[in-house]
């Protein structure tokens, strides 16, 4: 089945689809480093298919500086020259928009041409599925209080017009994308109504879940075996004449013997103090650690892997270190520290209400809470549970919570890595979505 992946980010959604035999002909993403991450992931999938993961591991060993990423890749291209064209054709580092107002943008007409070139390269004559959708940050509930004045004029709101144009052009059987719950409630539900009506005009039905009552279609990924509380909406659209049903994710959920906790997810990763570790260098696994000491989840994350990258603990200010210790002590007693409970000398914000939950620990014995892109700005909402380490999560720890396997390398400077991880659809969830969507499409042959 041929897929186009729009607004790909670091490839979290397409990873699950790739795993279940969908062929992703094109990834469209505006962020440069997210595209480089997707390219590295395509290296991995290509070399795995060639039965040459040794070469991928070699790449992980040598590529320890994002500034000379091209040099690091040279020896892979030397062995497989065809890879260079594959990456060029399948990863489109482009931004949707109007080139008249934004010189960095690509018009929808040009974007359609580029995607057509990608399809030709893949020898695809039609598109079965479009995955990924416009990031409606402007409608995110978290963002809504901060963006009170700008919600109406945020140009990102118009992205779905571009998205619709692509759907209309390639006429896939279906499209699927993940979004924040706010998309259903924005402007008293008018925004979602508008989305449905505008797809109706081009012959598509859009469903937000199995319930007639849209707002009850919010799902928590934790209920599907993903080790994270993450509430999202999965929108599924299809050609009216196909009359599909909404995919049954429940049927494919992951079952663990007991609910996953932070301990199951990150406790095998090396202990780091702030400023220790490496952004890009490969950590090989500690072979003295017996397999019997690893959780089933940790074993799953280590499949096809000799180690992991992106494990650097960011530096921390003295004041924050003190707050983290207090927060971890609270967590030990099963409590979350509230900002107004901090000693006066540690407070820096006058508006205590807005920052009430500013500091949050991923406690050992409970399921991790949602990881979002804000983790690129500071780690206060993602504090490591070990008081000895007294730091925020590394990119790799956040990636574990998001369900990215250890051999998934995030390229670029650390801030870009954190953003990529925080914005991603967890690959474990996208695998569930892929299987359920496949059932729907195949059931209607």
UniProtKB/Swiss-Prot annotation:
Pfam families, alphabetized: DNA_methylase (PF00145)
Organism domain of life: Bacteria
Annotated active site: 136
The keyword Transferase appears for this protein: yes
Signal sequence, start to end: none
Keywords annotated in UniProt: Antiviral defense, Cytoplasm, Methyltransferase, Restriction system, S-adenosyl-L-methionine, Transferase
GO cellular component terms given for this protein: cytoplasm
Reaction equation(s) it catalyzes: a 2'-deoxycytidine in DNA + S-adenosyl-L-methionine = a 5-methyl-2'-deoxycytidine in DNA + S-adenosyl-L-homocysteine + H(+)
PROSITE patterns assigned to the protein according to its UniProt record, in alphabetical order: C5_MTASE_1 (PS00094), C5_MTASE_2 (PS00095), SAM_MT_C5 (PS51679)
Entry keyword annotation includes Transferase: yes
Gene disruption: observed consequences: Cannot be deleted in a DISARM-containing strain of B.subtilis.
Enzyme class: transferase
Entries under NCBIfam families matching the protein: dcm
The name this protein goes by in its record: Type II methyltransferase M.Bpa9945I
Taxonomic lineage from the root: Bacteria, Bacillati, Bacillota, Bacilli, Bacillales
């Amino acid at each position: 089945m041929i897929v186009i992946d729009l607004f790909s980010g670091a490839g979290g959604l397409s990873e699950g689809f790739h795993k279940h035999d969908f062929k992703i002909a094109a990834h469209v993403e505006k962020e440069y480093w997210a595209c480089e991450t997707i390219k590295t992931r395509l290296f991995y999938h290509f070399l795995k298919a060639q039965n040459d993961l040794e070469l991928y591991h070699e790449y992980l060993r040598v590529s320890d500086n994002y500034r000379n990423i091209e040099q690091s890749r040279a020896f892979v291209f030397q062995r497989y020259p065809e890879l260079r064209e594959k990456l060029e054709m399948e990863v489109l580092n482009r931004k949707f928009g109007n080139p008249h107002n934004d010189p960095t943008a690509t018009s929808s007409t040009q974007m359609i041409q580029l995607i057509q070139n990608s399809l030709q390269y893949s020898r695809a004559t039609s598109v079965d599925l479009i995955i990924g959708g416009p990031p409606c940050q402007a409608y995110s509930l978290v963002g809504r209080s901060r963006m009170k004045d700008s919600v109406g004029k945020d140009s990102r709101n118009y992205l779905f017009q571009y998205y619709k144009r692509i759907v209309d052009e390639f006429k896939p059987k279906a499209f699927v994308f993940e979004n924040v719950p706010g998309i259903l409630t924005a402007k008293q539900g008018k925004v979602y109504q508008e989305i449905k009506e505008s797809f109706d005009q081009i012959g598509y039905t859009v469903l937000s879940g199995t319930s007639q009552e849209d707002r009850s279609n919010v799902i928590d990924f934790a209920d599907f075996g993903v080790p994270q509380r993450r509430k999202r909406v999965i929108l599924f659209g299809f050609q009216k004449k196909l009359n599909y049903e909404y995919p049954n994710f429940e049927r494919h959920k992951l079952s663990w013997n007991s609910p996953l906790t932070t301990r199951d997810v990150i406790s095998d990763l090396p202990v780091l103090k702030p400023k220790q570790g490496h952004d890009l260098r490969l950590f090989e696994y500690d072979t003295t650690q017996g397999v019997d000491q690893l959780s089933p989840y940790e074993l799953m994350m280590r499949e096809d892997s000799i180690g992991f990258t992106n494990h650097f603990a960011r530096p921390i200010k003295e004041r924050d270190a003190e707050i983290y210790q207090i927060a971890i002590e609270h967590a030990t007693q099963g409590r979350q520290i509230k900002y107004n409970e901090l000693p006066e000398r540690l407070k820096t914000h006058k508006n205590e209400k807005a920052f009430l939950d500013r500091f949050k620990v991923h406690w050992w014995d409970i399921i991790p809470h949602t990881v979002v892109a804000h983790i690129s700005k500071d780690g206060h909402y993602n504090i490591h549970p070990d008081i000895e380490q007294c730091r925020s999560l590394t990119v790799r720890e956040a990636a574990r919570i998001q369900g990215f396997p250890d051999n998934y390398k995030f390229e670029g400077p650390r801030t870009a890595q954190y953003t990529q991880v925080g914005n991603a659809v967890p690959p474990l969830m996208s695998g569930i979505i892929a299987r359920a969507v496949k059932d729907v499409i195949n059931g209607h042959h």
